[in-house]
Amino acid sequence: MIYIIYRYRYCLVYTMDIFKELILKYPDENVLISPVSILSTLSILNHGAAGSTAEQLSKYIENVNENTPDDKKDDNNDMDVDVPYCATLAIANKIYCSDSIEFHASFLQKIKDDFQTVNFNNANQTKELINEWVKTMTNGKINSLLTSPLPINTRMTVVSAVHFKAMWKYPFSKHLTYTDKFYISKNIVTSVDMMVSTENDLQYVHINELFGGFSIIDIPYEGNSSMVIILPDDIEGLYNIEKHITEENFKKWCGKLYTKSIDLYMPKFKLKMTESYNLVPILENLGLTNIFGYYADFSKMCNETITVEKFLHKTFIDVNEEYTEASAITGVFMTNFSMVYRTKVYINHPFIYMIKDNTGRILFIGKYCYPQ
């Protein structure tokens, strides 16, 4: 039990760190990532890391392993994400390395199916190989991770993808879906298909902080997962939440959730990224500088000098009346309107959303601010 709690804490710190870096980089765009997919990929890299590279990775990885029970320390699958049943969840991570490099048997034994050698000189074939793998692992929801061939001097490329599908515990009634306004800002308004689900007992809280008020609602799926939505009271109030969302604050806010009868109005949306995130600059900003470039030390992988050239991540989400299907995270927005016993929650302006399992581990996290 100590091991699980310790692991969750570091996963949450890492999640908030990388999410805040991304929303700073893309302040006016929808943001969508899968923290567990990225973290498990870093765990794979950690098996081959040494020296200062291993020290930097230990900020997010080694602190977990130090508290792993002795009988699990040599488990070949210790980089895998332990996710309880929550309908369909497929996490796809792969390391592609040059076929001219001879890797240590101990490293290959640990990473198993997450590793593949390729001929980077055949750039188009390698691109198609990677894209076909991603398409298969995401059930066809992401057709391509690479839009152009990799440089022929590439030595190693890390890719990650994830596919999630779960039915709502309280489905929205299709016949109640209607066209409503979505406020991108106070002066910019568009239309969305608004889904409706009434008289459901959900976890909910309204928080008042010095930087503004906001609501949090936890919407369950069948199984052991749920969607958490953070909705500012002010149409343009999401920026203040983004500045203050940390591991400590998020745990504090969610600790105040209580059961309440809710009428929920939530936009139906589908989000598909046209370009992959290259997470190299994001990870460097978080202190993982020695994974990339001259100082990278992956001597536990092989005897040659090798470095990560690209760290790619791409996401997809489909939120409708029956289910959420994602190659990333889903999102919702909320505002209150008090009645005698029920609260009406209208998700009609920018919000943060997450999908988590019942241990609190965040599988997906995103920001929805612009209907596509």
Swiss-Prot record:
Segments traversing the membrane: none
Subcellular location: Host cytoplasm
Family: Belongs to the serpin family. Poxviruses subfamily.
InterPro entries: Serpin_CS (IPR023795), Serpin_dom (IPR023796), Serpin_fam (IPR000215), Serpin_sf (IPR036186), Serpin_sf_1 (IPR042178), Serpin_sf_2 (IPR042185)
GO MF terms held by the record: serine-type endopeptidase inhibitor activity
PANTHER family on file: GH10112P-RELATED, SERINE PROTEASE INHIBITOR, SERPIN
Organism domain of life: Viruses
Protein name per Swiss-Prot or TrEMBL: Serine proteinase inhibitor 1
GO CC annotation: extracellular space; host cell cytoplasm
Biological function: Plays a role in mediating viral host range. May act to inhibit a caspase independent form of apoptosis to allow efficient virus replication in infected cells.
Gene3D superfamilies reported for this sequence: Alpha-1-antitrypsin, domain 1, Antithrombin, subunit I, domain 2
PROSITE patterns: SERPIN
Keyword field: Early protein, Host cytoplasm, Protease inhibitor, Serine protease inhibitor
Site entry: Reactive bond: 337-338
